[in-house]
């Protein structure tokens, strides 16, 4: 069995030195725009449509949500999965999400908020860049989450 041991010459880092270490300028993310243009909402760059999400079952639907808003280029399979697994809120309640805009907005706002709170961004402009880029990546299906968020 392998074991790790401390090397005599290895530096010891006090716990105090680790607190807020991420706010050091050289440790910031340094986010640049690649998929977005300043002042333009990534959601406004694509065509949207209202459709129904439906997963059939043997005798009745396993899942159904009518009137959901999705990018026009997303498949019906993506619509069904996202509406069933990723939209938050009880079905037929006012809190129930009904648009990819709501779902991605919720996720992006949460992650960008964590970045702001953790000092990952140099300034608010960088935080807004990060949020816009993540929104564009997700809505254009360049990346997705592995589990419901």
Question: Across the structure, where does each feature detected by a protein language model lie?
Answer:
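Extended catalytic cores of very large enzyme megasubunits
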Residues: 1-149
């Amino acid at each position: 069995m392998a074991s790790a041991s401390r090397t005599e010459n290895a530096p010891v880092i006090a716990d105090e030195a680790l607190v807020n270490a991420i706010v050091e300028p050289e440790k910031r993310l340094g986010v640049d725009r690649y998929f977005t243009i300043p002042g333009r909402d990534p959601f406004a760059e694509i065509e949207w449509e209202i459709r129904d999400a439906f997963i059939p079952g043997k005798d009745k639907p396993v899942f159904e949500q009518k009137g959901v808003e999705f990018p026009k280029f997303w498949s019906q399979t993506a619509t069904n999965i996202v509406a069933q697994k990723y939209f938050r809120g009880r079905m037929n309640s006012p809190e129930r999400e009904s648009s990819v805009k709501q779902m991605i907005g919720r996720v992006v706002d949460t992650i960008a908020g964590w970045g702001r709170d953790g000092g990952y961004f140099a300034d608010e402009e960088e935080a807004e860049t990060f949020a816009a880029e993540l929104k564009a990546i997700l809505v254009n299906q360049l990346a997705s989450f592995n589990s419901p968020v």
